[in-house]
Design a protein with these regions (language model features):
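Membrane-embedded alpha-helical segments of integral membrane proteins
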Residues: 2-43
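Generic structural signal for short, solvent-exposed loop/turn connectors between secondary structure elements
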Residues: 3, 43-52, 74-81, 91-94, ...
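Cytosolic-side transmembrane helix boundary signature
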Residues: 32-62
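N-terminal capping segments
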Residues: 56-155
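...with weaker cross-activation on analogous glycine-rich loops/strands in unrelated enzymes
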Residues: 74-78, 127-207
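Short, low-complexity, Pro/Ser/Thr/Gly-rich segments in the mature regions of secreted, periplasmic
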Residues: 222-232
Length: 232
């Protein structure tokens, strides 16, 4: 029994970093990540088992974390979250484009705009000790969403602001930092950084880059301007 338990822990220890570092993610890989993480959490439980007081404190700590995550959300600070989102998006500049990727080792267009918000929301949840934001970060991480899905308001995360025949036709008065521009064919999405500047994980040069609006490339495509409800 001890040998099987040790092998299980070893498997979890190998699986967790591999699943985290792998650029591409699927529902199966995310489930595997959670299983490996929970498996590693059983190590301190096993070590504390012979000591009742230590075991009680450990179980109480786990219970406290679970209870805390169920507490009501605090009033959101959309400005702080938007600033954090823009900061996270910029950390991906020059990252390699990988279809289905969701981290700095490789990322695609929808992965970029979603993962930036996952990271920003998780960081703000810890900074503000907000269980509501923690739950939202987990939701954003768990449920994948393509560019097309984001343009259709998937799970109520986004809503439409306006439509335009291309980026140059967008009314600047309608733009807010953090807004998303989804091409109307649903193939691509970019995020607005401000000052006529957008960030995108571009499948053409196969990298993430920041550009000002020009009359070429994706900037000539018909678009739907979407806004994250979290940032309002």
């Amino acid at each position: 029994m001890r040998r099987l338990l040790f092998l299980f822990w070893l498997l979890c220890g190998v699986t967790l970093p591999l699943s985290v570092l792998r650029p591409e993610t699927t529902s199966a890989s995310k489930l595997l990540t959670l299983v490996a993480l929970l498996g590693l959490c059983t190590i301190p439980l096993k070590l504390a088992a012979p000591h009742r007081r230590a075991l009680f404190l450990l179980l109480a700590s786990f219970a406290l974390v679970l209870i805390t995550l169920q507490l009501p959300a605090r009033a959101p600070d959309a400005t702080a979250l938007r600033d954090a989102y823009l900061t996270e998006l910029r950390t991906y500049d020059t990252a390699t484009y990988v279809w289905g990727g969701e981290n700095h080792r490789g990322i695609d267009c929808s992965g970029l705009v979603r993962r930036g918000l996952v990271d920003a929301t998780a960081n703000e949840a810890m900074r503000r000790r907000d269980p509501g934001l923690a739950r939202r970060a987990l939701e954003l991480w768990w449920f994948d969403a393509s560019a097309q899905a984001l343009g259709e308001g998937y799970r109520g995360w986004t809503h439409e602001v306006t439509r335009a025949k291309d980026f140059l036709s967008l009314d600047p008065a309608l733009l807010r930092q953090g807004d998303l521009a989804v091409t109307q064919d649903g193939l691509h999405v970019l995020a607005y950084l401000g000052d006529s500047t957008w960030i995108q994980a571009d499948p053409v040069p196969m990298r993430v880059h920041v550009d000002r609006v020009t009359a070429k490339g994706w900037f000539t495509a018909p678009i739907t301007l979407m806004r994250w409800r979290l940032l309002e």
